[in-house]
Amino acid sequence: MVPDTEPNIFRAPDLKESPSEKFRPFLRRPVFWVSFAAAGVLLILVLSAFPLMTRQAGPAARRVQSKSNLRQMGLALQNYHGTFGMFPAGTVSVPELPVEQRFSWILPLIPFTDQPLRTEVRAEAGWQSAEHAELIDTSQIIYRNPEQRLERPFRSAGDYVAIAGIGADAAALPENHPRTGVFGHDRRSTLESITDGLSNTLMITTLVQPNRSMFAGGRETVRGFSQQPYLNGPDGIGAVAGTKAVQILLADGSVRSLSPAADATLIEALATKAAGDRVADQSEW
């Protein structure tokens, strides 16, 4: 259950002279109508060129928006940590439910974003409960990658995943395991526990395909890197089709780009939070 301590979370017109009376002499001048016609032609030219301009700028604009989404998540996570002294766990803790039926880390983070929920949530019922049908039909724009063009199973389907570390079992590992990352099903990391360095530790990145729902716990929203190639490989983590870089959010709140061909040792070092790995200078990523 989401803790109760979390924040839920003109001047009147001048009647002495009407606009039509004031400007009537000007309206009679030929220069006005010539200028008006020229402006109309210019407007038509601009509007006709707009679709082409949009198509040309589209990919760059979508990439910028995806980075903005990650920055907003980073800010929300920092604010959450500032409030509770730790980051949210990978799933909302309901021990009676399998992790796949629990709500994801996104639910407790929502009060710290500018898109509050308009429906009530009962975490112990699980995200797939019929009482949450309206919620699952809700979209939260910052969790949708604008670069993603594939069809979504639900309106709440998301495109970002929290990183649990290295290995298929990473999300279930204990806190002190060297393969652990920031997120785990029941792990709550602190800034102090990220001893590899905040700027060297990966928190959230993009999925190749949309998940079932951003509210779904388990592998839908928390994954470890388990099979090489780590990016655009079997784990489903990486760049969406048609893009050339993977956007990542680091624990210091910064957003960086990685090549899908990034070296496996770099990915492993970024994915863990306290393994003592040496991370190459960011200029080498």
Stretches found by the model and what they are:
Residues 30, 48-285:
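Internal low-complexity, small-residue/proline-rich segments
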Residues 1-32:
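Low-complexity, intrinsically disordered extramembrane tails and loops of integral membrane proteins
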Residues 35-49:
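Hydrophobic membrane-insertion alpha-helices, especially the h-region
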